[in-house]
């Protein structure tokens, strides 16, 4: 095998989308025992990649500085001392999985614990953008949000047309089937910033209701609209990607004993001035943040197992739809980043390696 591979890099270490380029002299990773070297076919594009490109979300320095949190591909080499005879994996297997980084490259090392066999029903393009998206949604709903049919009768996803929320809305609609199959499905709501995205959320994803945030520039009154379409009731679980300016209105929309899972700050991390935090007490509210990339291998492996057992079958049989908005050749990865930055997508953007 050649000594070098091609990988996406950033001129001067950080910069805008236009600074991305293909570095043809990137060393191929050395594969260790317990790992597989994967020849990458496709990778998903995520907000974390954009933050890393901007120098605001560093990679795991002792592993790789290459962007890319999810991939699909083919096993090229087994780790040292690993053989197909004593291993479930073999060279040529089609796989996909979650990464700490490194997916924007021709080859990537992956811990075997995080590998998932690609079903024949899924293309490399579909599989390449699955894990970061669906694992994040699963984590928010089940691991942190602690969904139960008894205590979670309503769920709200902010940024409802984002890839994670698209997955999360679908998971929420069917969450009772995992927890308590005889219980009614929860009511699922979302917010978005364009009317066509709200229509997509309701018509294509089947949400109970969606609110156009562009009609609520005060960043507060949307909460009243959500409660109105929820028959006057508050929301039990809110998953938020918008950030600081929405803390108070998230408290407004919560039901008693409601939870907020904070996964991002698209509108910035700073709260509005004079935020009223009384809702923390009066509603017994809980707010918890999370960042999937910083989680341990053991934690991520639990998500992997949950996905393989309870989500992947639904992606194969059609219960869940993995919405791929755009497939872009990787030498135009800058265009893929710009699509996300300009909020032009309803679903996932995936790059394919030629």
Report the location of each language-model feature.
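C-terminal capping/lid region of NAD(P)-dependent oxidoreductase domains
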Residues: 3, 317-326, 334-354
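Mid-domain Rossmann-like dinucleotide-binding core that forms the NAD(H)/NADP(H) cofactor-binding site
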Residues: 128-216
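NAD(P)H dinucleotide-binding glycine-rich loop of Rossmann-like/cofactor-binding domains
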Residues: 51, 69, 84, 94-160
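Glycine-rich beta-strand-centered segment in the early N-terminal region that forms part
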Residues: 27-44, 56-102, 122
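N-terminal Rossmann-like NAD(P) cofactor-binding module of classical short-chain dehydrogenase/reductase
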Residues: 96, 236-239, 261
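Glycine-rich phosphate-binding loop and adjacent beta-alpha segment
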Residues: 201, 245-319, 352-354
């Amino acid at each position: 095998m050649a000594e070098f591979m091609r990988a996406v890099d950033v001129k001067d270490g950080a910069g805008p989308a236009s600074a991305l380029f293909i570095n043809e002299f990137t060393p191929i990773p050395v594969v260790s025992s317990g790992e597989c070297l994967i020849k990458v076919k496709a990778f998903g594009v995520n907000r974390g990649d954009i933050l890393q490109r901007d120098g605001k979300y560093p990679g795991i320095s002792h592993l790789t500085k290459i962007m890319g949190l999810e991939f699909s591909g083919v096993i090229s080499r087994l780790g040292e001392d690993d053989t197909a005879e004593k291993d479930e994996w073999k060279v040529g297997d089609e796989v996909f999985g979650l990464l700490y980084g490194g997916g924007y490259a021709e080859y990537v090392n992956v811990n075997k614990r995080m590998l998932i066999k690609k079903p024949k029903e899924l293309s490399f393009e579909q599989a390449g953008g699955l894990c970061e998206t669906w694992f994040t949604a699963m984590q928010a709903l089940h691991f942190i949000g602690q969904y139960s049919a008894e205590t979670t009768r309503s769920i709200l996803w902010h940024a409802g047309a984002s890839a994670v929320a698209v997955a999360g809305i679908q998971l929420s609609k069917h969450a009772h089937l995992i927890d308590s199959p005889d219980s009614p499905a929860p009511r699922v709501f979302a917010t978005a910033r364009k009317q066509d995205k709200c229509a997509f959320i309701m018509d294509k994803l089947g949400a109970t209701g969606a609110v156009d945030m562009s009609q609520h520039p005060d960043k507060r009154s949307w909460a009243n609209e959500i409660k109105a379409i929820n028959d006057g009731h508050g929301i039990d679980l809110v998953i938020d990607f918008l950030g600081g300016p929405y803390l108070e209105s998230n408290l407004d929309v919560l039901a008693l004993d409601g939870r907020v899972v904070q996964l991002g700050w698209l509108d910035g991390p700073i709260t509005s001035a004079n935020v009223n935090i009384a809702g923390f007490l009066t509603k017994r509210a809980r707010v918890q943040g999370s960042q999937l990339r910083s989680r341990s291998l053991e934690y991520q492996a639990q998500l992997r197992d949950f996905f393989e057992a309870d989500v992947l079958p639904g992606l194969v049989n059609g219960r869940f739809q993995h919405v791929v908005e755009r497939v872009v050749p990787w030498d135009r990865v800058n265009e893929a980043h710009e699509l996300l930055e300009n909020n032009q997508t309803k679903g996932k953007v995936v790059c394919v390696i030629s």
